[in-house]
Curated annotation (Swiss-Prot):
Its EC number is 3.6.1.31. NCBIfam families: histidine_hisI (TIGR03188). CDD domains: NTP-PPase_HisIE_like (cd11534). HAMAP family: HisE (MF_01020). This is Phosphoribosyl-ATP pyrophosphatase. One of its GO terms (biological process) is L-histidine biosynthetic process. Belongs to the PRA-PH family.
C-alpha cells in the first residue's frame, strides 16, 4: 500500500488558505465566491453520486466520488468555521459507546 501524499488535514489547510488568499480562476475560490448555497448544492450532488457509484460493486468511480464528496465537505467545514480537530473530537467522543437501536429511526429497505 502506498502512502497517501494528501492527508485530510493537509487538504483542509489548503482549502482554508485558499479562502484567506483567493486565487482567481480556482475552483475553490469559485465555491467560496458563490457562497454557502452553492457549496451545499455541491455536497448534495456529490453525496448522490457516491450513493449511485456504491450500488455497483465493480464501479471504480466510487473512490473518485468519495474523494470529491470529501473535498466538498471540507469546503463546507471551512465555510462554516468547523475544524478537522472538532470532527475528530466528536468522533472520539463516540468511541466505545453502545448503540441504542431502539432510539434510532427504523431504516426501511427501498
Amino acid at each position: 500500500m502506498t502512502q497517501a501524499k494528501q492527508s485530510i488535514p493537509a487538504l483542509y489547510d489548503f482549502i482554508k488558505e485558499r479562502q484567506a488568499n483567493p486565487v482567481a480562476g480556482s475552483y475553490t475560490d469559485y465555491l467560496f465566491t458563490k457562497g454557502l448555497d452553492k457549496i451545499l448544492k455541491k455536497v448534495g450532488e456529490e453525496s448522490t453520486e457516491v450513493i449511485v457509484a456504491a450500488k455497483n460493486p465493480d464501479d471504480p468511480a466510487f473512490i473518485l466520488e468519495v474523494a470529491a464528496l470529501t473535498y466538498h465537505v471540507l469546503v463546507l467545514m471551512v465555510e462554516r468555521g468547523i475544524t478537522v480537530d472538532q470532527i475528530a473530537t466528536e468522533l472520539a467522543s463516540r468511541e466505545g459507546k453502545k448503540s441504542r437501536l431502539q432510539e434510532r429511526s427504523k431504516i426501511e429497505k427501498y
